[in-house]
Design a protein with these regions (language model features):
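Alpha/beta catalytic cores of nucleotide-metabolism and tRNA/nucleoside-modifying enzymes
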Residues: 1-43, 48-129
Length: 129
């Protein structure tokens, strides 16, 4: 509420304890925030499969969007395994090992959009030229 009162136009709400876990969004935290603010809230942290996206949009209609990362990373890495030259970016040993996170079901933006549209969830659609 303070952020809104100080002039924030949008809140990106991250459940840090759920980041990278694939356990789903923190619905209780999200509800507590969306009930007290009138500005858009984008939620982040916990998405591990497509169903998590549908659940959060269907259960908490006050959110304006989601931010996702892990469910996109592993699909990307499978396609683009050449990590040479990125050693300075951090620990890439896990990515090179080809291990997967058991709670995270990899996907891509096309699949996400098709899934959301199939569930009648508003989604900005970008058409290829």
């Amino acid at each position: 509420k303070n952020a809104e009162e100080l002039g924030a136009g949008e809140i990106v709400l991250t459940s840090v304890d759920r980041e990278g876990t694939g356990s789903g969004f923190d619905s209780e935290l999200i509800k507590r925030v969306t009930e007290v603010v009138s500005i858009p809230v984008v939620v982040h942290g916990g998405a591990g499969r497509l169903e998590h996206l549908a659940q959060i949009f269907n259960n908490i209609t006050e959110i304006s969007g989601v931010s996702i990362a892990s469910i996109l990373h592993y699909d990307y890495i499978k396609k683009y395994k050449d990590l040479d030259g990125y050693e300075s970016e951090g620990n890439i040993d896990f990515l090179r090992s080809s291990k997967s996170m058991s709670h995270i079901h990899s996907t891509n933006l096309t699949n996400i959009k098709e899934y959301l549209i199939s569930k009648n969830i508003n989604c900005r659609v970008v058409h290829d030229n």
